[in-house]
Amino acid sequence: CSEADTMPSILRVNGRRRLEGEVRAAGAKNAALPMMAAAILADEPVLLAGVPHLLDVDTMGRILRELGIEVLWDEDDTVQLRTIDARPVRAPYRLLRRMRAGFCVLGPLLARRGEAVVALPGGCAIGPRPVDLHLAGLKSLGAEIELRHGYVVARARQLRGATIRMAGPDGPTVTGTANVLSAA
């Protein structure tokens, strides 16, 4: 029996004062990053609301700018993403080394531009998390994948649908699933 099985379904807090007011819930970085990367796929501007202003989100914005995406913020944690140059296909190591989620641009670049040159992601405090499932999933869709000097070079004339299992010996990969789904 796990701890979750023994927890009550209702948690009641009895305090001395009645709570009143409003709480603004921030958006989730781990949801925002793959959505920002997926904006590469769009013909029209993409608006994402509730995107938290965090270092990783800023880094993703910098990666997208390198890939020809205009990134505009408003005062309400809304970001507008719009393709202004559909030619760049290279996501540089100097930015991807800062966060693993930058690797999420691989699938959208491949699907949209037919080619992607994306640096292998940098280190992680959690430990090694390989991208083999990302690459296997993209190969299942018809991509040609090469590893060259620390970069993944992916090409596809036309991706095709496939049944793919996005789990390996260490379990499923959320980022890999987002990457492959955005290419499909």
PLM feature spans:
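Structural preference for solvent-exposed beta-strand-turn elements
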Residues: 1-184
